[in-house]
Curated annotation (Swiss-Prot):
This is Photosystem I reaction center subunit VIII. Pfam families: PSI_8. SUPFAM superfamilies: Subunit VIII of photosystem I reaction centre, PsaI (SSF81540). It is a single-pass membrane protein. May help in the organization of the PsaL subunit. Keywords: Chloroplast, Membrane, Photosynthesis, Photosystem I, Plastid, Thylakoid, Transmembrane, Transmembrane helix. It comes from the Eukaryota. The lineage of its organism: Eukaryota, Viridiplantae, Streptophyta, Embryophyta, Tracheophyta. GO terms for cellular component: chloroplast thylakoid membrane; photosystem I.
Length: 36
């Protein structure tokens, strides 16, 4: 049961949280260095 339930929580978490952190860090990097 745990093996079937864990991916159903873990996959959306990685799929949503990781891109959000990547976009946030990228926007902070651009704002600091003023590339745009």
């Amino acid at each position: 049961m745990i093996d079937l339930n864990f991916p159903s929580i873990f996959v959306p978490l990685v799929g949503l949280v990781f891109p959000a952190i990547a976009m946030a860090s990228l926007s902070l990097y651009v704002q600091r260095n003023k590339i745009v």
